[in-house]
Structure formats: C-alpha cells, structure tokens
UniProtKB/Swiss-Prot annotation:
Involved in heme d1 biosynthesis. Catalyzes the decarboxylation of siroheme into didecarboxysiroheme. This is Siroheme decarboxylase NirD subunit. It catalyses: siroheme + 2 H(+) = 12,18-didecarboxysiroheme + 2 CO2. Belongs to the Ahb/Nir family. GO terms for molecular function: lyase activity. The gene is nirD.
C-alpha cells in the first residue's frame, strides 16, 4: 500500500466530511484530485483492504435490528444463504461452525417489521430463526493505526 492510500485510510476511517462533495474535500486535504481519491477507494476495495465506504448508523436509534441464526442442513446451506441475502433487511450473513451455522443481521423500521421478516424467513426456508436482539451496546474504537509511510 502506498503513502497516499495509507494517509487516505488513516485520516478518514473514522469519519468522512459531511458536505455536498466529500470526495473533493478529501482530495483537497490529501493534496490530490477527486478522481484519484475515488480510484484509490475502488482499488482498496478490490484488493480487500476496504470493505465499504459509508455511514455506521446507530441502528437502535434509526429503527430496529437483531442478530439471527438458522440451523441449516449442510446440503441446503448455499441455497438458504443465497435466499437470505435477497432480503433487503439483511445486512450480511455468514457461516459458522455450530448447529446454528448461518448467522445474519436484520435491520428494519421497527420491531414489528423485523418480526414479519423473521416469520417470512421461517415460512420461506422451513427453518425457525433464532432471534437474538441486542440488549446493550458496548462500543469499541474500530480504527486501525496506519503508518504514514514505510
């Protein structure tokens, strides 16, 4: 990773400029062009160094969310995971080595909508979701220290 990419990640991993043209503002701060910032972000994402650019919302204030899991027979896991991914309310899902082997996060406007989606998933898959709503959030600093240059 080159110096500009490191500086870009180090400076903006905890917040983007809140303005009409955030990438232009980032470019001005970093001393490069807006096109260069956008290209770096695309490259970092393609290389797997960056998973996404976007807000981190406090979902408990913006609506409702829950962590859910399904115990999926191994031979159905791929099909069920693909189906779960099609729900707009599903942020992401992942496989685990456990009886409950497919985990996913659901977000919705309110708890009633979450319950409807969980019921739909149960009807759709024939599997009963384990619903694990958050009780309390313990926030941690997710920033990673990055050297300016090597």
């Amino acid at each position: 990773m080159d110096d500009l990419s490191r500086r870009l990640l180090a400076r903006y991993q905890k917040g983007l400029p809140i303005c009409a043209e955030p990438y232009r503002r980032m470019a001005e701060t970093l001393g490069c062009s807006e096109a260069e910032v956008l290209e770096r972000l695309r490259r970092l994402e393609a290389d797997g160094a960056l998973s996404r650019v976007g807000p981190v919302l406090r979902h408990q204030r913006a609506g409702a969310s829950t962590l859910a899991a399904l115990a999926v027979p191994e031979e159905r896991l791929q099909r069920v995971a693909e189906r779960i991914s099609q729900y707009a309310e599903v942020n992401h899902n992942y496989q685990r080595e456990h009886r409950y082997n497919l985990w996913f996060v659901l977000t919705a406007g309110d708890r009633a909508q979450l319950d409807r989606v969980l019921a739909e998933i149960a009807a759709d898959t024939g599997l009963q979701p384990l619903d694990l709503p958050m009780q309390e959030a313990y926030c941690i600093d997710l920033a990673f220290p990055l050297e300016a240059s090597r």
